[in-house]
Regions:
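A structural detector for beta-sheet-dominated domains
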Residues: 41, 61, 80-82, 89, ...
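Helix-rich interaction surfaces within compact, conserved domain-sized segments
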Residues: 3, 7-8, 85-135
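Short aromatic-glycine motifs in intrinsically disordered, low-complexity regions
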Residues: 35-49
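Phosphoinositide-dependent membrane-docking surfaces
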Residues: 49-67
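Anionic N-terminal interaction surfaces
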Residues: 1-33
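Short gly/pro-enriched beta-turn/loop segments at secondary-structure junctions
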Residues: 33-35, 72
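Short, surface-exposed polybasic-and-hydrophobic patches located at secondary-structure transitions
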Residues: 65-95
């Protein structure tokens, strides 16, 4: 047996489709118990690295626009840091909250709506607001 091949290759041509069966392969987020920061890939094509040392709180609520927009994502997650507030809309956010609670959430980013049915955790949108320091 060849000891150099200790892992299986993913034969799926579509990594998003493979993610439905494995939460570790979800393109919307990843978990790493050794991280000290959360990387946020915002929908404006900017990325931000936020230190867990500045984490304040997270709030998971039903999406308030569901009453007027039935096609809207069902959940809203707000992650507040000292200098930034991250807002995400999507579904299945409990796994993200659990990873955040342990400071193991490595990154978050959105994936197209067409993947929502394939993923247990789907992030439809990610926005960040940076807090300006007052001189």
């Amino acid at each position: 047996m060849n000891n150099n091949m200790n892992h299986l290759m993913n034969p799926s041509a579509d990594p998003i489709a493979a993610s439905a069966s494995s939460p570790r392969d979800n393109p919307c987020f990843d978990i790493d118990p050794t991280v000290a920061t959360l990387i946020v890939f915002a929908d404006d094509e900017h990325s931000y690295m936020l230190p867990y040392a500045q984490f304040l709180y997270a709030e998971l609520i039903p999406n308030p626009v569901l009453e007027t927009q039935r096609e809207a994502p069902p959940e809203k997650l707000t992650i507040r840091f000292v200098a930034a507030e991250v807002e995400m809309f999507g579904s299945g956010f409990r796994s993200i909250v659990r990873a955040l609670q342990k400071y193991e959430l490595k990154f978050v980013k959105s994936a197209g709506r067409r993947y929502a049915a394939l993923l247990k955790t789907h992030i439809a949108t990610v926005a960040i607001t940076l807090t300006k320091e007052t001189p």
